[in-house]
């Protein structure tokens, strides 16, 4: 397993990505075809920036990527990507202005993850809280027909979370990329075709 992980780490370094997580997004795009040239994309939990770099490349010069993370990063981003260090749980004027500048979004992606404690229940609960925050950003900023990708730790509350997304999207899928560690509890939920919120 260590050799398997090292493969992705070395590949990321060779291809100038700051983290191996880029290959998870690459697999997600290959499976669900969520990216296109000219899109507006919001990347939550963006540091150190691999997903942002991949997204910027996929949307091209006519697209825009807004990357947000509570942590800073030294990664250099292309002109079509903007990185903002901010807490998504705090609606600061700077964060709201940055989010609203590119409205509407074609795609919102979230690789947000909590600092793990080793306590399974606590880690799952903290992951769910981040996923709920990402979901709450969707209604006012994702365009009709847009897509949503969110990382979540598997647990008893996942079904209820998925059910909430089914009320918002035409299709909702679970997907665990091959580049995820086999023993990892993380997987991704993909919402395709945003319809709005059912009343």
UniProtKB/Swiss-Prot annotation:
Catalytic function, reaction form: uridine(2552) in 23S rRNA + S-adenosyl-L-methionine = 2'-O-methyluridine(2552) in 23S rRNA + S-adenosyl-L-homocysteine + H(+)
Keywords, ordered alphabetically: Cytoplasm, Methyltransferase, rRNA processing, S-adenosyl-L-methionine, Transferase
EC number from the UniProt entry: 2.1.1.166
Domain of life: Bacteria
Entry-linked Pfam families: FtsJ (PF01728)
Residues forming the catalytic site: 151 (proton acceptor)
Subcellular location: Cytoplasm
Family designation: Belongs to the class I-like SAM-binding methyltransferase superfamily. RNA methyltransferase RlmE family.
Described purpose of this protein according to its UniProt entry: Specifically methylates the uridine in position 2552 of 23S rRNA at the 2'-O position of the ribose in the fully assembled 50S ribosomal subunit.
HAMAP family tied to this protein: RNA_methyltr_E
UniProt-recorded name of the protein: Ribosomal RNA large subunit methyltransferase E
Organism field: Maridesulfovibrio salexigens (strain ATCC 14822 / DSM 2638 / NCIMB 8403 / VKM B-1763) (Desulfovibrio salexigens)
